[in-house]
Curated annotation (Swiss-Prot):
The modification Phosphoserine is found at S79, S257. Residues 42-44 are annotated as: Tri-arginine exosite. It comes from the Eukaryota. Its main location: cytoplasm. Its EC number is 3.4.22.59. Changing C264S: Reduced palmitoylation, leading to increased cysteine protease activity. Cysteine protease that plays essential roles in programmed cell death, axonal degeneration, development and innate immunity. Acts as a non-canonical executioner caspase during apoptosis: localizes in the nucleus and cleaves the nuclear structural protein NUMA1 and lamin A/LMNA thereby inducing nuclear shrinkage and fragmentation. Lamin-A/LMNA cleavage is required for chromatin condensation and nuclear disassembly during apoptotic execution. (Microbial infection) Proteolytically cleaves the N protein of coronaviruses such as MERS-CoV and SARS-CoV. The cleavage of MERS-CoV N-protein leads to two fragments and modulates coronavirus replication by regulating IFN signaling. The two fragments produced by the cleavage interact with IRF3 inhibiting its nuclear translocation after activation and reduce the expression of IFNB and IFN-stimulated genes. The same mechanism seems to be used by other coronaviruses such as SARS-CoV and SARS-CoV-2 to enhance their replication. This is Caspase-6. It comes from Homo sapiens (Human). Heterotetramer that consists of two anti-parallel arranged heterodimers, each one formed by a 18 kDa (p18) and a 11 kDa (p11) subunits. Interacts with BIRC6/bruce. Interacts with RIPK3.
Length: 293
């Protein structure tokens, strides 16, 4: 009887090992590859947009003409998705750090996620504010689990529109593709954002979106705004509330890669191309389905 009783309790020799294997089996069976982030909180969340057009003269950085078109386009698209959008223009480094610290310390308990966009010049692992550069990891670090508890397990999306190198992407035309580019007005000149930005790890549930692959120029039109933000906003408008977000970003990569420089003061840039990239540390599928009121 004692032996049978032991079997029922799971204590005979080898029993604990067998139960562990069984538990592991059921855990594997319960793993859902299509699991989605919980996006039915009261609020969608905050979307910060730091827009930098002009810089302190001592930095010798050129104006980023067209960036206000990016800011307005992003504001419209993220508002449509239900975000509370907050825009800041040409902040000094100290001001920018203060604003982002304030947002990192408020409660996001009733929010789905968080978005932060930087429209600026970049260099290495830094992004430029009006008067100085700021380390990107300093900014993302404010939203890690040990600093921002209310965003633990929630998507944290950082979008960086900045140049990331000193090379243009040389176009290679696929044999089965004819590149039919639409004509553009001469007044809409293509420029590049200065310097370079590295791909940086951030942590679980972060998504780092870059306007261009590391080591290459990011192109911006002086009237319409940057290629990346134009195409990101177009895809958000068409598929933002239906398509899984990393799938949408892949479409953005394709759209931007089909562009080329037509008008530029630098003749060597004519015909050059650009491919964005993103580094996903997301652990579930991310959808921005419309909220039910």
């Amino acid at each position: 009887m004692s032996s049978a009783s032991g079997l029922r309790r799971g204590h005979p020799a080898g029993g604990e090992e067998n139960m562990t294997e069984t538990d592991a089996f059921y855990k594997r069976e319960m793993f859902d590859p299509a699991e989605k982030y919980k996006m039915d909180h009261r609020r969608r969340g905050i979307a910060l947009i730091f827009n930098h057009e002009r810089f302190f003269w001592h930095l010798t950085l050129p104006e980023r003409r067209g960036t206000c078109a990016d800011r307005d386009n992003l504001t419209r698209r993220f508002s449509d998705l239900g975000f509370e959008v907050k825009c800041f223009n040409d902040l000094k480094a100290e001001e920018l750090l203060l604003k982002i610290h304030e947002v990192s310390t408020v409660s996001h308990a009733d929010a789905d996620c968080f978005v932060c966009v930087f429209l600026s010049h970049g260099e290495g692992n830094h992004i430029y504010a009006y008067d100085a550069k700021i380390e990107i990891q300093t900014l993302t670090g404010l939203f890690k689990g040990d600093k921002c508890h209310s965003l633990v397990g929630k998507p944290k999306i950082f979008i960086i529109q900045a140049c990331r190198g000193n090379q243009h992407d040389v176009p290679v035309i696929p044999l089965d593709v004819v590149d039919n580019q639409t004509e553009k007005l001469d007044t809409n000149i293509t420029e590049v954002d200065a310097a370079s930005v590295y791909t940086l790890p951030a942590g679980a549930d972060f998504l780092m979106c870059y306007s261009v692959a590391e080591g290459y120029y990011s192109h911006r039109e002086t009237v319409n705004g940057s290629w990346y933000i134009q195409d990101l906003c177009e895809m958000l408008g068409k598929y933002g509330s239906s398509l899984e977000f990393t799938e949408l970003l892949t479409l953005v990569n394709r759209k931007v890669s089909q562009r080329r420089v037509d008008f530029c003061k630098d003749p060597s840039a004519i015909g050059k191309k650009q491919v964005p990239c993103f580094a996903s540390m997301l652990t579930k599928k991310l959808h921005f389905f419309p909220k039910s009121n």
